[in-house]
């Protein structure tokens, strides 16, 4: 298995769920639940990058490693770049960005995306996707789709329905035609440290700004993104109070069974 580090960006502010990293899930803060899952992935180290002292204290109280980072980062990728510089990781090291609101993330998925990047020397980034079967999701702009080339490198990410079945969608849009390779992007990324160090110097692209998808900056500037396809959709993260209750219920069920 490839050696890799994990960084968990955990911003305290959230428009829909203030103080989200500290939300209680079965007796532990959400960020600690994510930390525990990441530790099970076999990473060389796991760090939480936060902008709030309460999150820092919660992670350290749980025996985790955490860093205070700037509050004004425009994206999670920029926050990762600050972390890799602070910790002095080598240019060819691999770093997996695990979102701080993914307490149900599978450790094996974290390890797999790191391995996908390690196995692809021409890629700067690796990410994941899964087959999408519902037409309602294909046409939902909140669902990000990705199309790939023959080597599993991303050609484009979009909120629009891609690829477009010209003839089938001309008459009906209730179903996805059989064989249409529709993939839903999963927001899990592995990066080479060398790419993270140059990311901040890359000018934002018009496509990135129109789509509001920061990974398009990498494609715009010619960097390759390896897409690892998984058969089943990973568990969703926490964006709303309703999501939080769903995750709490999942942990309660697990603890009753376990």
Curated annotation (Swiss-Prot):
InterPro entries: Cytidylyl_trans, KdsB, Nucleotide-diphossugar_trans. Belongs to the KdsB family. It comes from the Bacteria. This is 3-deoxy-manno-octulosonate cytidylyltransferase. It comes from Aromatoleum aromaticum (strain DSM 19018 / LMG 30748 / EbN1) (Azoarcus sp. (strain EbN1)). GO terms for molecular function: 3-deoxy-manno-octulosonate cytidylyltransferase activity. It catalyses: 3-deoxy-alpha-D-manno-oct-2-ulosonate + CTP = CMP-3-deoxy-beta-D-manno-octulosonate + diphosphate. Pathway: Nucleotide-sugar biosynthesis; CMP-3-deoxy-D-manno-octulosonate biosynthesis; CMP-3-deoxy-D-manno-octulosonate from 3-deoxy-D-manno-octulosonate and CTP: step 1/1; Bacterial outer membrane biogenesis; lipopolysaccharide biosynthesis. NCBIfam families: kdsB, PRK05450.1-3, PRK05450.1-5, PRK13368.1. Keywords: Cytoplasm, Lipopolysaccharide biosynthesis, Nucleotidyltransferase, Transferase. GO terms for cellular component: cytosol. GO terms for biological process: CMP-keto-3-deoxy-D-manno-octulosonic acid biosynthetic process; lipopolysaccharide biosynthetic process. It is found in: Cytoplasm. Its EC number is 2.7.7.38. It is an enzyme of class 2 (transferase). Activates KDO (a required 8-carbon sugar) for incorporation into bacterial lipopolysaccharide in Gram-negative bacteria. Pfam families: CTP_transf_3.
């Amino acid at each position: 298995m490839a050696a890799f580090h994990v960084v968990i960006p955990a911003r305290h502010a959230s428009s829909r769920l203030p103080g989200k990293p500290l939300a209680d899930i079965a007796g532990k803060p959400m960020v600690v639940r994510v930390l525990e899952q990441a530790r099970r992935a076999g990473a060389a180290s796991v760090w939480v990058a936060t902008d709030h002292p309460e999150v820092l204290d919660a992670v350290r109280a749980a025996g985790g490693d955490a860093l205070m980072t700037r509050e004004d980062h425009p994206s999670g990728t920029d926050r990762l770049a600050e972390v890799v510089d602070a910790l002095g990781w080598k240019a060819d090291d691999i770093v997996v960005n695990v979102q701080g609101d993914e307490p149900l993330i599978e450790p094996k998925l974290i390890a797999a995306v790191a391995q996908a990047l390690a196995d692809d020397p021409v890629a700067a980034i690796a990410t994941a996707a899964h087959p999408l079967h519902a037409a309602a999701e294909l046409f939902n702009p909140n669902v990000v789709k990705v199309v790939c080339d023959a080597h599993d490198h991303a050609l484009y990410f979009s909120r629009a329905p891609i690829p477009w079945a010209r003839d089938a969608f001309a008459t009906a849009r209730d179903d996805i035609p059989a064989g249409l390779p529709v993939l839903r992007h999963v927001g899990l990324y592995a990066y080479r440290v060398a790419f993270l160090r140059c990311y901040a110097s890359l000018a934002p692209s018009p496509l990135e700004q129109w789509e509001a998808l920061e990974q398009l900056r990498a494609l715009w500037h010619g960097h390759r993104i390896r897409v690892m396809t998984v058969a089943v959709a990973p568990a969703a993260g926490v964006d709303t109070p309703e999501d939080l209750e769903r995750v709490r219920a999942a942990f309660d069920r697990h603890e009753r069974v376990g």
